[in-house]
């Protein structure tokens, strides 16, 4: 999507990046992307704050604490970025440009794949010749994405698409969305456990914006991000996805090669410089 961004308008917004980070561990691609985002915001004069929550094992509680920290600040936009997500910092500015107070982008996110390899999609790409020129392109067909479209809708790749659910791994939420949520669902106020912090000492209530729950009508078990989207949509707000954004979702993978299988295929079991050179020439 071609989006004209007015930097002077973006400077009116303040970006609060929140990352729940159990064990204080993050991925290298996330670290590099966050550093690039910090540099980009500094270059354009956009105020940005990074907030990390370490050692909270319950993700629902961690996200609620992050939101409370945001709401007690004067920042305008909260961006959840999970510690295993790599991203293009320009996409963050695009989300901010789209999510103005006048727009109906109450929640807007980028699309990222789940940590799985969908071999049938890779096979389909190979059969259709998508990897004939460069086999490295097969990585584009890996994984199922973390969102569910609105039933009966058609998604256009080059513009924001309304969805029923999307993940918090790369999700922007403006302040007004949380305020409307709190107003519509006053029963979500609760007393947080004491966590040895001056802001969470059990003396005041905060809102439960995130919770995992079984949805009554469908019987589905909703994760905390899908539950949040469900509740937001139930009171007339909207959830959007930017299909053109490219995100990386890092995880562990077990490599299980098989020498007899490679022999049957007729390929080298070790690194073959000649085959690699052929691939590079085709790029």
Feature-to-residue mapping (PLM):
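N-proximal low-complexity "stem/linker" segments adjacent to membrane-targeting elements
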Residues: 1-57, 61, 281-283
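C-terminal catalytic/acceptor-binding lobe
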Residues: 2-16, 183-283
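Active-site nucleotide-sugar/metal-binding loop of Leloir-type enzymes
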Residues: 64-77
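Conserved catalytic core of nucleotide-sugar-dependent glycosyltransferases
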Residues: 67, 88-212
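Hydrophobic pocket-lining residues that define ligand/cofactor binding sites across diverse proteins
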Residues: 70, 99, 232
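Short, Asp-centered acidic motifs that coordinate Mg2+ and/or phosphate
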Residues: 77, 106-107, 239
């Amino acid at each position: 999507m071609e989006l004209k961004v007015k930097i002077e308008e973006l400077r009116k917004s303040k970006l609060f990046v929140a990352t729940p980070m159990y064990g204080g561990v993050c991925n290298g691609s996330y670290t590099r992307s966050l550093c690039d985002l910090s540099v980009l915001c500094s270059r354009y004069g956009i105020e940005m704050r990074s907030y990390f929550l370490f050692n909270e094992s319950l993700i629902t509680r961690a996200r609620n604490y992050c939101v409370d920290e945001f709401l007690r600040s004067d920042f305008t936009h909260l961006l959840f970025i999970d510690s295993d997500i790599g991203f293009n910092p320009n996409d963050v500015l695009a989300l901010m440009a789209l999510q103005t107070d006048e727009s109906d982008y109450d929640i807007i996110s980028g699309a990222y794949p789940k940590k799985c390899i969908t071999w049938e999609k890779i096979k389909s790409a190979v059969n259709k010749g998508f990897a004939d020129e460069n086999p490295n392109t097969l990585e584009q067909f890996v994984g199922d994405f973390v969102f569910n479209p609105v039933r009966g809708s058609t998604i256009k790749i080059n513009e924001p698409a309304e969805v029923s659910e999307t993940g918090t791994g790369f999700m922007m939420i403006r302040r007004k969305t949380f305020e409307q949520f709190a107003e519509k669902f006053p029963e979500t106020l609760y007393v947080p456990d004491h966590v040895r912090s001056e802001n969470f000492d059990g003396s005041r209530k905060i809102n439960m914006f995130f919770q995992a729950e079984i949805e009554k009508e469908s019987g589905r078990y909703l994760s905390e991000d899908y539950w949040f989207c469900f509740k937001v949509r139930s009171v007339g707000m909207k959830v959007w996805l930017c299909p053109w954004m490219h995100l990386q979702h890092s995880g562990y993978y077990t490599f299980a090669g098989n020498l007899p299988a490679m022999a049957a295929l007729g390929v080298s079991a070790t690194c073959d410089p000649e085959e690699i050179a052929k691939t590079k020439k085709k790029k």
